[in-house]
Amino acid sequence: ESPSPLEDPGCVGLMENMKQDEHGFLFHYLLPFSENRFLLEVTRFTPEKVPWDRMEHDLAGALEGYGFSHAVEKRREKGILPMGLPTQKQPTGPRWAIAGTRGGAIRPATGYAFQRIAEWAESCARSIAEDGCVLSQPCFPRSIRWMDDLFLRLLRGKPELGPQLFMRFAGRLSPGQ
């Protein structure tokens, strides 16, 4: 929470301040909730785990960069999203399901999963209500897995291209996407 109002509380910052350094590809999400409340997420896209003290340093720098060095922290989360994991063998039987991260819900090249998990949960609940069967998380199509694998291999081999590649992708999206 910021003691002074945000510059534009109606503007969301997605993948801002992108840069590549010795710890990987870094960017920020800034999601305002009101004139003075916001969520600031510092994200690292890297094949190696980044030490938490480095992430704390990155967060302090982001707060200062946005002019929020006097903000009051109300809640903190931290986590690691494993990306590019091999697809797990799906169990058989009406009472078993693999879902979420282990079920392949995370898009390997982006880390996004929320919409896929929500859609799976809805169809799984409907299936349970209709015939008592639990559904596993559906796999991404082979073409998507191939493209994401190619993208991740490119980033591993040439990590300095991260900001440029993500900006190129973002430039081709509409606001609704």
Tell what function each PLM region has.
Residues 1-15, 68, 79-82:
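Central beta-strand plus flanking loop segment that forms part of the substrate or channel wall
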Residues 8, 68-73, 176-177:
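Short, surface-exposed acidic
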Residues 20-22, 46-124:
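FAD/FMN-dependent oxidoreductases across multiple families
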Residues 24-27:
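Short, surface-exposed coil-to-beta transition loops
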Residues 31-34:
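A short, hydrophobic, proline-anchored segment that marks a local hinge/packing element in signaling
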Residues 37-38:
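Hydrophobic residues embedded in beta-strands of well-ordered beta-sheets
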Residues 122-177:
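C-terminal helical "tail/cap" subdomain of flavin- and related membrane-associated enzymes
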